C-alpha cells in the first residue's frame, strides 16, 4: 500500500467518526426548533430521534457481513447518494413520517461509514500503534461534537432553518466521497485476492465476551452519567449555565485526553493500562457523585481526561483477539457499545423518575465498576500479547 493511499484511508476513518459525532451530538441543539417546525411538544419529538440511533445500530451490525459482499468503496459512494436523499428529504418535506425516514437513513449511512472507518484503522495499523491511531480517530467524534453545536447555534441565532445544520453535516460526507477517488481499499470476502493456503477460521475466545460487556456497560454508564449531570447539578443549587459548563468541560477534557493517550498508549500494555484507567474512572465518578459543588468542576475534568481512552482501547483489544483483524469481531464489539447508547434513557429514565438524578449517576458508577471487573478478568484470557509478539517478528 502506498503512503498517499494510507493517508487517504486514514482521513476517511477520521471523517467517518466526525460524521457520527456531528449527527448524534447536534440533536440537543436542534430538537426544539424541529418540534416548533412540526408543531409538536419536545418530549414527543425526542422519540423520533430514536430512528437515528436505530439506523446506526442496525447498519453497524449488518455491515459485519455486508463488508464481505459489497466492496468498501461502493458502500461509501452509495452512502453519498443516500446522504443527499436524506438531507433533501429534511429540506423539502413537512411530513413527520418522512422526517423519521430521513433520520433513519442518516443513521444507516453514519453506522456503515463508522464501521468502515474502524475496520480500516484496525487493518492498516498493528499492535500498540493501532490503539493510538484508533484513539486519535475517535477524537474526531468529540471534535465534531464541539464544532457542529457551535455551527448550529450560529445558524439558529440568525433565524436560518434547522435543516441547514444537516446540510453542513452533509459536507463532511462530501469530503469522504471525494477521498474515495483514486484510493484503493482493502478487499474482503469474495473480492479478496485468492491464496493457495486455506484461511483457518479463528475462534474469538472468552476475552471477546468480556470486552463486549465492557463496551456496553461503558457507553451506557458514560451517557447515563453525562445526560443527568445538569439535572443533578441544578438540584444542588447550581445555575443552568454552570450545569451546562460541567458537561462542556467533560467533553473538552475528554478530547484532550484522547490526544494525550494517543501518544501515551504506545508505551504500555493495553490490557493493563485499560484496567488502571477503568478503575480510576470508577473512583473519580464516585468522587463527583458524592462530592460538594465546589469540587465538581475539577472532578469532572479529571474524569473526562482519564476515561477518554477506555472505549477505543476496548475496541483495539477486541481487534487483537485474533491474529488477523476480523471485521465481524470489531463490529460485534461496536454493536454492543451502540446498544448501550440505545438503552441510555430506557435504563436511566425510570431510575430518575423513582429515585432522582443522583440515583442515575450512582447506577452509571456501578456500570463503570463492571467495566473495571471485565478488564481485570480479561488479563487472564486475552490473546493480544501473543498476537503482538507474532506481528513484531
From Swiss-Prot:
Transmembrane segments: 11-31, 51-71, 78-98, 101-121, 134-154, 162-182, 206-226, 245-265, 273-293, 297-317, 332-352, 361-381
UniProt topology in membrane: Multi-pass membrane protein
Family matches, as SUPFAM superfamilies: MFS general substrate transporter
Principal location: membrane
Molecular function terms from GO: transmembrane transporter activity
GO CC term (a single one): plasma membrane
Subcellular location: Cell inner membrane
Xref: PROSITE patterns: MFS (PS50850)
Keywords assigned: Cell inner membrane, Cell membrane, Membrane, Transmembrane, Transmembrane helix
NCBIfam families named among the record's database cross-references: PRK03699.1
Similarity-based family: Belongs to the major facilitator superfamily. TsgA family.
Protein name: Protein TsgA
Organism: Shigella dysenteriae serotype 1 (strain Sd197)
